[in-house]
C-alpha cells in the first residue's frame, strides 16, 4: 500500500464525476517516493510522500 512512513498519509477514496454527473469510485494515492534519509547520523531507506520530502529539504536548508 502507498503510505508515508513519516506522516502516515494513506490513500483516500472519492468519486470520478463525469459531465453527466455519474459518480464512480476512485482512489487518491499519495505521491510516495523511496528515499535514503539520514536520521541520527544513520542512513535509512524510507517511503516518504513528496510533502514530507519537501519539508525535510527545507529544514536541511535552514539548518
From Swiss-Prot:
A Pfam family hit: Ribosomal_L28
GO cellular component terms, semicolon-separated: ribonucleoprotein complex; ribosome
UniProt keyword annotations, A-Z: Ribonucleoprotein, Ribosomal protein
GO terms classed as biological process: translation
GO molecular function terms attached to this record: structural constituent of ribosome
Domain of life: Bacteria
Protein family according to the UniProt entry: Belongs to the bacterial ribosomal protein bL28 family.
Protein name as catalogued: Large ribosomal subunit protein bL28
Organism: Thermomicrobium roseum (strain ATCC 27502 / DSM 5159 / P-2)
Lineage per the UniProt record: Bacteria, Pseudomonadati, Thermomicrobiota, Thermomicrobia, Thermomicrobiales
Gene name for this UniProt entry: rpmB
Amino acid at each position: 500500500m502507498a503510505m508515508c512512513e513519516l506522516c502516515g498519509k494513506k490513500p483516500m477514496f472519492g468519486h470520478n464525476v463525469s459531465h453527466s454527473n455519474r459518480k464512480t469510485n476512485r482512489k487518491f494515492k499519495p505521491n510516495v517516493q523511496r528515499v535514503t534519509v539520514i536520521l541520527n547520523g544513520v542512513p535509512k531507506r524510507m517511503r516518504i510522500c513528496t510533502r514530507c520530502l519537501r519539508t525535510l529539504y527545507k529544514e536541511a536548508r535552514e539548518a
